[in-house]
A protein has these predicted regions:
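Central regulatory/effector-binding core of bacterial HTH transcription factors
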Residues: 1-58
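C-terminal regulatory
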Residues: 40-43, 55-167, 193-199
Length: 199
């Protein structure tokens, strides 16, 4: 079974869940395609897609397994677990998404908050942004499932509701009755649902 997902989801949530699934279902072979590019399930480039999206393609079937929430994070040593109102963070350096990352919601939010003036460092992946803030006093927006599980970081704000994005597990309609696909989407869907509740 070929599964496609993003690097951030794989590193932050799925690697552990996939390993558990492999232990419980040793006869199902997993091939994981880690890419921020959307692979075509209709062309059978993958059997299952696990993707954050507000608008899943109508040609696919699946279910929303939760909502990815995002907050502002900073390096724990520098911030010492201090919460800060967002408006006070505009005086600090920000790390933002590069346009090639394709995170239009975050780009728009940062522009609307006037944060582009204090953002002189841009990275084209969430994992890159996470790594970059570990090195200094800058702040950035990260999915809570990444930031909360990184002991070197601390959350500085509440979750930013306008950056919430649904997480979907999707497959081609012709595959939805295939037993291994049903088992995988059921088990991994439940794991993700639980993980996102606590993130």
């Amino acid at each position: 079974m070929r599964v496609t997902t993003t690097d951030t989801l794989f590193a932050g949530l799925l690697a552990t869940s996939f390993e558990k699934f492999r232990g419980d279902y040793p006869d199902i072979k997993l091939e994981v395609v880690i890419s921020n590019q959307v692979h075509s399930l209709s062309k059978r480039e993958a059997d299952v897609a696990i993707r954050p999206t507000g608008n899943p393609p109508e040609t696919l079937v699946g279910r929303k397994v939760g909502v990815i929430r995002q907050s502002v994070y900073g390096q724990r040593h520098y911030w010492q677990n201090r919460r800060a109102p967002l408006d006070t963070l505009t005086g600090h350096q920000w790390i933002g998404p590069d346009t090639h990352m394709g995170n239009r919601a975050l780009e728009t939010w940062m522009a609307r908050k006037g944060l582009n003036d204090v953002c002189n460092y841009r990275v084209d992946s969430m994992l890159g942004m996470q790594t970059a803030i570990r090195a200094g006093d800058a702040v950035t927006v990260l999915p809570d499932y990444l930031g909360e599980n990184d002991s070197s970081l601390c959350r500085l704000t509440d979750s930013i509701a306008e950056l919430d994005i649904p997480l979907w597990i999707l497959t081609h309609p012709d595959l939805k009755r295939v037993k291994r696909i049903r088992e995988f989407t059921k088990v991994i869907g439940e794991e993700l649902r639980q993980a996102l509740v606590y993130a």
